[in-house]
Amino acid sequence: PGPTLHVRQGTEVVVNAANDTDLETTVHWHGLRLDNRFDGTHHTQDPIETGGAFGYRISFPDPGVYWYHPHIRQDYGQEMGLYGTIVVEPTDPHYWPPVNREITLTLDDILLTDGAVAPFSRTRTTHTAMGRFGDVLLVNGEPDLTLAAHAGEVVRLYLVNTANTRVFNVAIPGARIKLVAGDSGRYEREEFVQSDVLAPTERVV
């Protein structure tokens, strides 16, 4: 996946997206409230042709976790790793409950054939929904990512399901999980859970 972007609430940036792939594309800023002409979805802009570029003016009015990805041929683009997360840090220092540290995790899967990414159709999307089920699970692009925490340490996890089709059921055996936010921001009531189910494109904190 691409890099995690950390920005302050209220910031505005310009992202110059260059298309070096062999298919037309756009960049969609998933969950962000912004000017429609920069949203990157179908019919809000012309596709970025191969070798072309487009400048996106992006605002970040709300704290939370978001992500960016293609909105043309998502099945191809996302499977090839064209996505990344965005963490919008709140201006209110008390917006989030206190923690010792933060980690951003993208959940994905990929379909391999003979050790390589299974081929795609160039003319139509392949398999279920807008993508296909993979046979290798990935966290931050890694098939065997290992993380460690100290006893008593409180870690804020920004979780994003970037898979085309797969639903993930996330649990951490031996640790307490508290849900504090989702797609629409901070929850009014925090809740301890044994696990949490994330549908494709869903985000939780």
Language-model-detected regions and their locations in the chain:
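Solvent-exposed, conformationally flexible loop/turn segments
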Residues: 8-10, 49-53, 100, 152, ...
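Short, solvent-exposed loop/turn elements at domain surfaces
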Residues: 16, 24-27, 36, 96, ...
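A long-range scaffold signal marking pre-active-site subdomains of enzyme folds
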Residues: 1-32, 100, 163
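Extracellular/periplasmic metallocenter environments
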Residues: 21-25, 32-34, 39-94, 193-205
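Short, conserved beta-strand segments of beta-strand-rich sandwich/propeller modules, principally
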Residues: 14, 65-67, 156
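Conserved, well-structured core segments that form or line functional sites
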Residues: 103-105, 109-125
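Low-complexity, Pro/Ser/Thr- and charge-rich linker/hinge segments at domain boundaries
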Residues: 89-104, 114-115
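Histidine- and aromatic-rich segments of cupredoxin/plastocyanin-like copper-binding domains
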Residues: 36-49, 122-205
